[in-house]
Amino acid sequence: MSDINATCLPAWLALCPCVGDDVNPTLTRGGT
């Protein structure tokens, strides 16, 4: 599963930098 996650994470962030930047703080607050 590490392989898929490592490939999906960077690809998603690269394809959706705007969304990633907006979701980043949300995930940090809810995840932590």
From Swiss-Prot:
Keyword ATP-binding on entry: no
Posttranslational mods: Processed by the macrocyclase-peptidase enzyme POPB to yield a toxic cyclic heptapeptide. POPB first removes 10 residues from the N-terminus. Conformational trapping of the remaining peptide forces the enzyme to release this intermediate rather than proceed to macrocyclization. The enzyme rebinds the remaining peptide in a different conformation and catalyzes macrocyclization of the N-terminal 7 residues.
Domain of life of the native organism: Eukaryota
Entry keyword annotation includes Nucleotidyltransferase: no
Annotated propeptide span(s): 1-10, 18-32
Keywords, in A-Z order: Toxin
GO molecular function, one term: toxin activity
InterPro entries, alphabetized: Amanitin/phalloidin (IPR027582)
Location in chain, cross-link Cyclopeptide (Ala-Pro): A11-P17
Recorded family membership: Belongs to the MSDIN fungal toxin family.
Record function comment: Probable toxin that belongs to the MSDIN-like toxin family responsible for a large number of food poisoning cases and deaths.
Protein name: MSDIN-like toxin proprotein 1
Biological source species: Amanita fuligineoides
